[in-house]
C-alpha cells in the first residue's frame, strides 16, 4: 500500500476550505492607538481585541517593559529550571497568587501551553478522565487529547450532565474542567454548583478563567472569587496574561503541592524557555493597576449596559452575557461575513466568528468592549450595525474570507 502523500492531502484540504469559503486570512495591523487600529492604511475603531482594561499601552506598563529590557535584555535565555527564572518571574508569581488568594503560582508561555501542562502532569494514566463543558476553549479540549487520558463532555452549563459524566467514569483519577467565561458566548460557568459536583465525585476542579480575571469579582479577581469560591473549592486555576492584563503568557495558581508537581514534572514547563523578563515586568505593572483601578471595571459595566440596551432597542438577538464579550447572532456564515465587511467599510473592526469555531447556523459578530471605549464610540457602533443589517438584508449574500 502506498504511503499517503502529505502535500496532496494538504492541497485537498485547502481546496475544500476554498470551496466552503472558510479560508482564514490574517489582517496586518500597521499601528495601534488605544482602541484604534491602522489596517490597510485606514484607521478603524476596534471592537475585537481582548484588552478589556485598556492596559496594553498604558504608560506605566510600557515604561516597566522598557526599563526591564534595558536592564535584562530581550529574553530569559533559558528555561525556568536552568537559569531562566529571574527575580521578575518570582515576583509576578508571588503577587498574582496573593491577588487571587492562592498559596502558589507558576508562569507559562501561553494559556494553551499551561492547559496542556496541567493535564499531562496530573492525568497521566490511561484510565484517568477529564470531564469538560462542550463549549470549553480549544486548548482545554486539545490538552485532554494530547495528554492521552479520556475526554468526556457535557452539554453547555449542564451541571447534571457533568455529574453523569463523572459517575460514568469511576475507574481512574478525574478532573472537572471548565472555562470561567466562555470566549465565544460571553456567559459564565455555574462554578458553585460545579464545585459541589467535583467534590461529590472526588474530582479535581480546574477553572480556565482567561476572560474573567481582571474584569469580574472583587478587585478583578475573576469568576472564582465572584462566585465566593477559593482554593478549597477550586484547587487549580488558569489565568492568562494576554487578555485583561494586556500582555502575554499565563499563570496557573493553586494548592502548593499541585503547583510544585507541575514545576517538577510538566514537560511543557520544563522544556520551554521562560517568558522574557521585560514582558514579565510589564505584566507585573499591569497586575498592580488592575488591582487598583476599579474605575476601569466600572467603565466596562457602563459600556456593556449601553451596548446591550442599544442592541435590544434595535431588535438584535443578544446572548446571556454580562461580560465584555457581547456576541450578536447572525445565523449564516454569509450574513456574518457581509456584516463584518460592511462595518469595516463604516470604520469599525468587529470579528466575524463562524464554523467550525462555533456550531453551524450560529455565526456571530463577536463585539468586545474595552474600558478605553467611549459611550460615543459604542453608540456609533450600534448605528453602524443597524445600517449594516439594512444593507445586507437587501443584497445577495456570498461568504468571503
UniProtKB/Swiss-Prot annotation:
Q: In which pathway does it act?
A: Cofactor biosynthesis; biotin biosynthesis
Keywords carried by this UniProt record: Biotin biosynthesis, Pyridoxal phosphate, Transferase
Q: Which GO terms describe its biological process?
A: biotin biosynthetic process
Q: Which reaction does it catalyse?
A: 6-carboxyhexanoyl-[ACP] + L-alanine + H(+) = (8S)-8-amino-7-oxononanoate + holo-[ACP] + CO2
Cofactors that this protein relies on: pyridoxal 5'-phosphate
Record keyword Protease present: no
Which top-rank group of organisms is this from?
Answer: Bacteria
Residues that coordinate or bind pyridoxal 5'-phosphate = 111-112, 183, 211, 240
Q: What is its EC number?
A: 2.3.1.47
* Function per UniProt: Catalyzes the decarboxylative condensation of pimeloyl-[acyl-carrier protein] and L-alanine to produce 8-amino-7-oxononanoate (AON), [acyl-carrier protein], and carbon dioxide.
HAMAP family, per this entry? BioF_aminotrans_2 (MF_01693)
Record's protein name = 8-amino-7-oxononanoate synthase
Q: Which gene encodes it?
A: bioF
